[in-house]
Curated annotation (Swiss-Prot):
It comes from Alkaliphilus metalliredigens (strain QYMF). Keywords: ATP-binding, Ligase, Nucleotide-binding, Protein biosynthesis. Pfam families: Amidase. The keyword Cell division does not apply. GO terms for cellular component: glutamyl-tRNA(Gln) amidotransferase complex. The gene is gatA. The lineage of its organism: Bacteria, Bacillati, Bacillota, Clostridia, Peptostreptococcales. This is Glutamyl-tRNA(Gln) amidotransferase subunit A. InterPro entries: Amidase, Amidase_CS, Amidase_dom, AS_sf, GatA.
Length: 491
């Protein structure tokens, strides 16, 4: 089996059976990245030296018969908005181009404690604001399935790295679909956990009440194992889950979907949905029915205002969170200025890209006197309504099934001139963040042009175990993940 085809489970098994060393695996991925990432641009920083040093330590442990952890010897690539001690963390922005954090984010600490090896930091839309990874200050990431297409965003670097076989596990953040939409575009599994299940400490904030960290993997089983490591209370994040969740997500993963109640919201299958995506999702629904799931169409009236509410709330929070980047304490400082006010103005003008400025201006506007009630308050009222709508839906259904994105991966540069058209790529994902519930995107088919299509399963708060069981049952029957390693050979 080629290294780019291996799952986390394959690698763990290989270590147990002494088929290869940790150094072999890490070196194999590094060689592949060096050979092919010049075409894809998935990485901002490659951590070759430190990764090989950590691999040598783990090999020594294995030779002594010691345990190396749930993710022992698994290379992982981290989105470049999560703090990594001693490793540059830029948020793909000129503002933080030279920022080296003095500490690890909690997610990074947990991965390291489980034996994972940080292989690099991945490209993204600047400050996680975008749906195509075209807003990075440094490079445009390309979709490994078709180098003329975008990989989705904002975690496009992580999705592309996983799809290209540069790592068996990558980490992203999801504010309005930034894990699930790139997962759909790149043909991977991508999970946005329940808000609070995974600590946000050390994640550079975009919209604090919406942001959540999650994994990209090749298979649902890999995703379940990764979540096992990532989840849990963190005293450094007051919004993290208070009790320590003890769910073993891998155990009983093969429970099956017989008797599972699946809701299909009719609002997600109306005008604007690509016909090939619609057909692919409908085929997957038939498969669920054949497996014994109880499938029913129902109304989930959140799509009309969800996108508007999301962009109001997220931009408002961004304008506040990004106020700290003023050239005073850290981040970019303008070289030419007269006085403190001009220094701040010039630093922000030079440090932030066009999309970030657009959202800061929008956020400042909706929070300003005279407009707060008309926009921000209405959006927060809609948020409350959305939570209640989902709560009511989960009284009748175990999971909700929708397309992940209304469109196929689009051509690089196609939507950059029309922000509203770009924002519409998130129409099926934003409401999940507004409600704070978990959702997973899994591959469910391909277009005629062999572009991946993703299917989204949404669960109730903290129902990840049931959600992963449903995703696993469908994944195993569809068998699409088996096709992917061969397709991932980047030409």
């Amino acid at each position: 089996m080629k290294i780019e085809e291996m799952t986390i489970m394959d690698i763990r098994k290989g270590y147990v059976q002494k088929q290869f060393t940790v150094k072999d695996v890490v070196q194999g991925y590094i060689d592949r990245i060096k050979e092919l990432d010049g075409k894809i641009n998935a990485f901002i920083t490659l951590c070759e030296e430190s990764a090989l040093m950590e691999a040598a330590v783990l090999d020594e442990k294995l030779s002594r018969g010691e345990e190396i952890g749930l993710l022992g010897g698994i290379p992982v690539a981290i989105k470049d908005n999560m703090c990594t001690q001693g490793i540059k963390t830029s948020c793909a922005s000129e503002m933080l181009a030279d920022f080296i954090p003095p500490y690890d984010a909690t997610i990074v600490k947990k991965l390291r404690a489980a034996g994972a090896i940080i292989i690099g930091k991945t490209n993204m839309d600047e400050f996680a604001m975008g749906s195509s990874t075209e807003n990075s200050a440094f490079k445009v990431t390309k979709n490994p399935w078709d180098l003329t297409k975008v990989p989705g965003g904002s975690s496009g670097g992580s999705a592309a790295a996983l799809a290209a076989g540069f790592a068996p596990l990558t980490i992203g953040s999801d504010t309005g679909g930034s894990i699930r939409q790139p997962a759909a575009f790149c043909g991977t599994v991508g999970l946005k956990p329940t808000y609070g299940l995974v600590s946000r400490f050390g994640l550079i904030a975009f919209a604090s009440s919406l942001d959540q960290i999650g994994p990209f993997t090749k298979t649902v089983k890999d995703c379940a194992l990764s979540l096992q490591v990532m989840q849990g209370n963190d005293p450094l994040d007051s919004t993290s889950i208070q009790q320590e969740p003890m769910d073993d997500y891998v155990k009983d993963l093969d429970k099956g979907v017989k008797g599972l109640k699946v809701g299909i919201p009719k609002e997600f299958f109306q005008e604007g949905l690509n016909i090939e995506i619609s057909d692919s999702i409908k085929e997957a629904i038939k498969v669920l029915e054949q497996l014994g799931a109880v499938v029913e169409e129902f109304s989930l009236p959140v799509t009309d205002s969800g996108l508007s509410a999301y962009y109001i709330i997220s931009s408002a929070e961004a304008s506040s969170n990004l106020a700290r980047y003023d050239g005073v304490r850290y981040g970019h400082r303008a070289a030419v200025y007269e006085g403190i006010e001009e220094m701040m103005l010039n630093s922000r003008s030079e440090g932030f890209g066009k999309e970030v400025k657009r959202r800061i201006m929008l956020g400042t506007y909706v929070l300003s006197s005279g407009y707060y009630d008309a926009y921000y308050k209405k959006a927060m009222d809609f948020r409350k309504k959305t939570r209640n709508v989902f709560k009511k839906a989960f009284e009748s259904y175990d999971v909700i099934l929708t397309p992940t994105s209304p469109v196929l991966p689009f051509t690089i540069g196609e939507k950059t001139g029309d922000p509203l058209e770009m924002y519409l790529a998130d129409i099926y994902t934003v409401n999940v963040n507004i409600a704070g519930v978990p959702a997973i995107s899994i591959p469910c088919g391909f277009s005629k042009e062999k572009l991946p299509i993703g299917l989204q399963l949404i669960g109730d708060h903290y129902s990840e175990k049931k959600l992963l069981q449903a995703a696993y049952g469908l994944e195993q029957e569809l068998g699409i993940f088996k096709e992917m390693p061969q397709q991932r050979e980047v030409k």
